[in-house]
Amino acid sequence: MSQDYKTTLHLPATDFPMRGDLPKREPAILERWERDDFYAQLRAHAKGRPLFLLHDGPPYANGQIHLGHAVNKILKDIIIKSKHLDGFDAPYIPGWDCHGLPIEIAIEKKYGKVGVTLDAVQFRQKCREYAAEQIQLQRRDFKRLGVIGDWDAPYKTLDFRFEADEIRALAKIVDKGHLIRGTKPVHWCFDCGSALAEAEIEYTDKTSPMVDVAYPALDPSALAAVFNATLPPDVQLAVPIWTTTPWTLPASLAISVGPTLDYVLVEGPTHSGQRRWLILAEALAAKALARYGIAELLIHGSAKGAAMEQHILAHPFYPDRTIPLLLGNHVSAEDGTGAVHTAPGHGQEDHQVFQQYGLLNRYSAAELNPVDARGVYLSTTPPLGELTLAGLHIWKANPLIVDALRLRGVLLAAAEMHHSYPHCWRHKTPIVFRATPQWFISMEQAALRSAALKAITHVTWYPQWGQARILSMIENRPDWTISRQRTWGVPIPLFVHRHSGAPHPRSAALMRQIADRVEQQGVDIWYSLDQTELLGTEADQYEKITDILDVWFDSGITHEAVLLERGLPKPADLYLEGADQHRGWFQSSLLTGVAMDNAAPYKQCLTHGFTVDQHGRKMSKSLGNGIEPQDIIKTLGADILRLWIASTDYSNEMSLSQEILKRTTDAYRRIRNTTRFLLGNLHGFDPTLHLVPLSDMIALDRWIVHRAFELQQTIKAAYTRYDFAEIIQKILNFCSVDLGSLYLDVTKDRLYTMHENAPGRRSAQTAMYHLTAAFVRWIAPILSFTADELWSYLPGDHADNVLFTTWYDGLAPLPPNAPLTAADFDKLLTLRDHVTKVLEPMRANGVIGAALEAEITVAADADTAARWQPLTEELRFLFITGDVTVTPANTDGFFVSAQATTKAKCARCWHYRADIGAHPTHPELCGRCITNVDGPGEQRHWF
């Protein structure tokens, strides 16, 4: 080439870096956000707009944030930012859950239990200090994720004002008649030394003893007569029960049978040389006898369970205790024997049966529940023969009780069972049901259950199955145990009568007075309060309750203590948490909201799945498959983590591995490279001077703006329904297909070779400006750091931050009367695909190198040919080939053929043209390039 024409080309130029270098670049952006008070500015720009309120469920203030925390906070942040772009004012007030056992345990490890080195006041102060330290650590990590919010004024359940508002919320619930006191079996953790809520329980596999125990009939002949059978004088009769909790047998006070179940009187194994008949559910008889070593089913009679009611049995090892046969609808024929040993102090259904029969008052508290808070039998527990139970832990007692039953001849079968069993979520140890005096929010007393079920149907659930799940939970849940026997928490400030145990008749009013004091001095004031100040002459008749509130009550009333307190409306638009919160925060918030206001505190509930590795396994240190968010940020950047979260179907388990992160990084690179190319081609473009009206744009440029408009509508709708994976998929497809494989490739010729101010070049730049201005908004909620950086390179005057704007309004659909309609482009792009397919074998066989070396002939039906012939001169630019000829033919549709060109290659544009060499000034250039270099410039209309 005799002359260097590179200087006559307008190649891309931008300072926007090719490499994201996110771990280094993101902290600088964060510093600027902090310095400029970005969140306050965002709220100021949104002032006066409609409000969208996403209420933050508080994480627990203990330990570093993990991947699940990151997923939750980033999903919320994506929604908050998208709502700002959608024209809403979307405040975000983060919060922390600060009371409860994990913090108590942390302080106990350092200082010992209350009373060892610290009194209760000092202990609570250490808990408060510890929680504040943990909040600082977590707040730093949450901000590093790119999550914006009111981090300088979060809500904390340990704040005096919050604790006071929590007591006021409880007073409302008392006013509405939902609070009750009772001695009921509740989930109990021996390590906590306290009752547990449903949400504090997790199910883990456990191996338990499985025993069948015979309860002899006290009047065997009468019981046999129920089955229309005559009992021979030398035959014994017993009712076997099956249990996996032998330790509860000392508390066994009855046997329950199913009233409508069919029972049979069968021949059982001999006992002490005598025959013994057994009563078994007919559906379970053969299976039970097989456990007892009996192969043959010999039936002596049959009867319904209801016929056995009130017949009396003997306890298997307490001869003085009589055991009535009672009817219980909970008894099934699924497993066991069809007879259930009933210990009302250790089972909720057992307790209900005794309640129905009015039997609870016949027994002392120690008979109902012979186990103390640590899991040890009380000193009053009678021995089992020579086995002393008093002072023995129940888990140690299990095998000893089995041995004692065997010695007494009442053990019919014994084995081990591996099954799912409830454990304490904090200690990971097995829990039990244990009857203790507790405070409850009743599900029935003031019709809370039915009101909550109705409220659920007025909420929109994402995914939809969330509604059925929480409906089932509310339908079947017991009363909510809200009292805890611990130190660090909000007290239940009730005065109860010293003799009757009844709460003071002015309890709600007194609680509000106490709340006013707590707001000024904290919860310690309750414990130091001289009750004569509030009760006057009644003070001697009452005593204070020392229980504290369940931490799920703390977080469950944030709609009252945070939203109302900060002047925000109820219900919130959205609650968003992990799928486990159907039985946690969603449920506690629902119950308190309905109890106080007869309405759910949220309009929508969205749940996300848990994080797992690529094999679907839960991430854990023991498996070595855990990936911490801090490590991802340190090596790849927060935007990569945000992109993975957004691109994953969070309604199910969310898989993450190094390979998945690599694919996510590749996707990020595609987005970054696309935007960098757009910015590079906007070099020298000023939208105030060079923007071309949509109606004057080249047809292809107008079409890509149309495509961007369609995509923006799809993206906006997907943000509205929280489908972020669709957004990422659509954006990546747009980058690869519409832009990378088509538009950016086709427009290079115009952008590089035309005059700087040529209408065709400015048209392409205008389209690219519109694309970039829209694109940066599309990604801003997800790739917040990258969007912030990209925005700073966007030409022209604009707001300081992309989130101070709304969705881009410079896009528009193609009008129906456009010179080339959207339907026309669909056909042309189909034709382009056919051209590509025709050229592939030519390239593979060496007939051509680049597509520019091929000349194309399109034979089409008359109507199609007539539509395409005006475009003939410019179709080569759309196809990026040599000359294109369109001819009418007697065919349906069209047919494409190609041949290698014999023309010379232009040294500047690389097109093969017939007029190269015809111009002595520039013998190496085609006529088009000559007019672009020295002349008025070429004219384009279509491509």
UniProtKB/Swiss-Prot annotation:
L-isoleucyl-5'-AMP binds at residue 577. It catalyses: tRNA(Ile) + L-isoleucine + ATP = L-isoleucyl-tRNA(Ile) + AMP + diphosphate. ATP binds at residue 621. GO terms for molecular function: aminoacyl-tRNA deacylase activity; ATP binding; isoleucine-tRNA ligase activity; tRNA binding; zinc ion binding. Its EC number is 6.1.1.5. Keywords: Aminoacyl-tRNA synthetase, ATP-binding, Cytoplasm, Ligase, Metal-binding, Nucleotide-binding, Protein biosynthesis, Zinc. Binds 1 zinc ion per subunit. Gene3D superfamilies: 1.10.730.20, HUPs (3.40.50.620), Valyl/Leucyl/Isoleucyl-tRNA synthetase, editing domain (3.90.740.10). The keyword Phosphoprotein does not apply. It is an enzyme of class 6 (ligase). GO terms for cellular component: cytosol. SUPFAM superfamilies: Anticodon-binding domain of a subclass of class I aminoacyl-tRNA synthetases, Nucleotidylyl transferase, ValRS/IleRS/LeuRS editing domain. IleRS has two distinct active sites: one for aminoacylation and one for editing. The misactivated valine is translocated from the active site to the editing site, which sterically excludes the correctly activated isoleucine. The single editing site contains two valyl binding pockets, one specific for each substrate (Val-AMP or Val-tRNA(Ile)). This is Isoleucine--tRNA ligase. It comes from Xylella fastidiosa (strain M12). The lineage of its organism: Bacteria, Pseudomonadati, Pseudomonadota, Gammaproteobacteria, Lysobacterales. The gene is ileS.
